[in-house]
């Protein structure tokens, strides 16, 4: 069974992905979405800042959970931006 920390991290990341998907429906929402995604966690530092995310993704860290995730550019998806969007 998943721990609460893992479950919470999945919910936070899922919310970011859903916001990202919704951004494609309007320019105003896209601006709001980009701001909301960047408000979750803090910028990664050290080796994670330059190597955790792939394909130009931006690394974010959630200190309360000790979890890393990526904000992916439009053509990529996945936990580390490892998959091309279809």
From Swiss-Prot:
Residues 1-23 form the signal peptide. Residues 40-82 form the EGF-like domain. Pfam families: EGF. Keywords: Cleavage on pair of basic residues, Disulfide bond, EGF-like domain, Nematocyst, Secreted, Signal, Toxin. Residues 24-36 form a propeptide. The keyword Secreted applies. Disulfide bonds join 44-59, 53-70, 72-81. One of its GO terms (cellular component) is extracellular region. One of its GO terms (molecular function) is toxin activity. The keyword Ribosomal protein does not apply. It is found in: Secreted; Nematocyst. PROSITE patterns: EGF_1, EGF_3. Gene3D superfamilies: Laminin (2.10.25.10). Belongs to the EGF domain peptide family. Has both toxic and EGF activity. Its EGF activity consists of rounding cells (morphological change) and inducing tyrosine phosphorylation of the EGFR in A431 cells, but with a lower potency that human EGF. This is OMEGA-stichotoxin-Sgt1a. It comes from Stichodactyla gigantea (Giant carpet anemone). The lineage of its organism: Eukaryota, Metazoa, Cnidaria, Anthozoa, Hexacorallia.
């Amino acid at each position: 069974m998943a721990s609460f920390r893992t479950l919470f991290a999945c919910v936070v990341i899922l919310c970011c992905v859903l916001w990202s998907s919704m951004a494609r429906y309007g320019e105003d929402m896209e601006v709001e979405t980009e701001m909301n995604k960047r408000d979750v966690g803090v910028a990664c530092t050290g080796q994670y800042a330059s190597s955790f995310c792939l394909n130009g993704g931006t690394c974010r860290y959630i200190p309360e959970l000790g979890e890393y995730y990526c904000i992916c550019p439009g053509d990529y998806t996945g936990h580390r931006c490892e998959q091309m969007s279809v």
